[in-house]
Amino acid sequence: MRVTFLGTSGAVPTTERNPSAVLVRREGERFLFDCGEGTQRQMMRFSTGFDVSHIFVTHLHGDHVLGIPGLLQTLDFNDRTDPLAIHAPHGTRSQLEQLIEATGERPTYPLRIHQVRPGDTVLDREEYAVEAFETDHRTKSVGYALVEDDRKGRFDRQKAEEELGIPPGPKYSKLHAGEPVEHDGRTVQPEEVVGPPRPGRRFVYTGDTRPTVATAEAAQDADLLVHEATFAEDRRDRAGQTGHTTAKQAAELANRAGVKRLALTHISTRYAGQGKRLEDEASAVFEGERVFVADDGQAIDVPFPDAE
């Protein structure tokens, strides 16, 4: 899983930061979380590719959606034929449709808009799911968690070969798939050579929000939490009034949730060139492996929890 930050600014862009957008690539699929103005140019600039199958919108403030019409048009110009799904908070479909129609854009490829509520399983695939959770902003909003299923346990090849005398071959595959096999006159059960299931990865994206219990629950043991941090701690009151979070508050929430890595984004223009200040405020309370203020174009790999 690779996460590329396309836009990390607050409501107003700067020369260094574009409005909100994060692209996640998982096993060849590409998911876009929010699509602020200029997102398609960022995709070109940072070579992420345009083969996005789903756009997950947290809310309909302009800095999170104004890039959608232009991206849809470019996909059309590129002769896209695959369907594209846009997921947005319940009750916002008509606004989203008006935004797209206002540009005169009518994609020739299938475009579907799905409305989601907190608690919905937005996507349910064989190896992962995307779930919506409640956030607290000044308008209808949700966050999203991409949660992978548990993986098979490790296969103990040494035990299979040396202790049980099973030579490498088809029986290994059957055992790893959970099927017992016959060998040397006895039945070998999978659990004899296969360890316990290993957890998949959890990626969580909040969009704009005050700190919430629902976010902490969705981010429990997350491998990467991308949480907004619009303000420094001396503006905590202002953050609450405007439906936002401070860097320290995001770190406190990440601590409670047992998050492994915390990326701070949606940085106000007042902190241009002051990313370290926000990092320092967050790292003073965050006990995970790493907290960082994300930059446009920054890409990080999210390893499996048991990766060495």
Question: PLM features: what roles do these ranges have?
Answer:
Residues 1-48, 83, 144-146, 153, ...:
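Conserved beta-strand hairpin/beta-sheet module of binuclear metal-dependent hydrolase folds
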Residues 33-36, 52-60, 89, 204-207, ...:
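Active-site neighborhood of phospho(di)ester-bond hydrolases with catalytic His/Asp-centered motifs
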Residues 37-87, 115:
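Active-site metal-binding motif and surrounding structural segment of the metallo-beta-lactamase
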Residues 67-75, 99, 272-281:
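Metal-dependent catalytic neighborhoods of phosphoester/phosphodiester hydrolases
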Residues 80-84, 257-261, 287-289:
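A short helix->loop->beta-strand "cap" motif at the edges of active sites that frequently abuts
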Residues 80-115, 270:
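Active-site neighborhood of divalent metal-dependent phosphoester bond hydrolases
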Residues 117-264, 276-280, 284, 306-308:
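Metal-dependent phosphodiesterase/nuclease catalytic metal-binding core
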Residues 272-298:
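Short acidic, glycine/proline-enriched helix-loop-strand junctions
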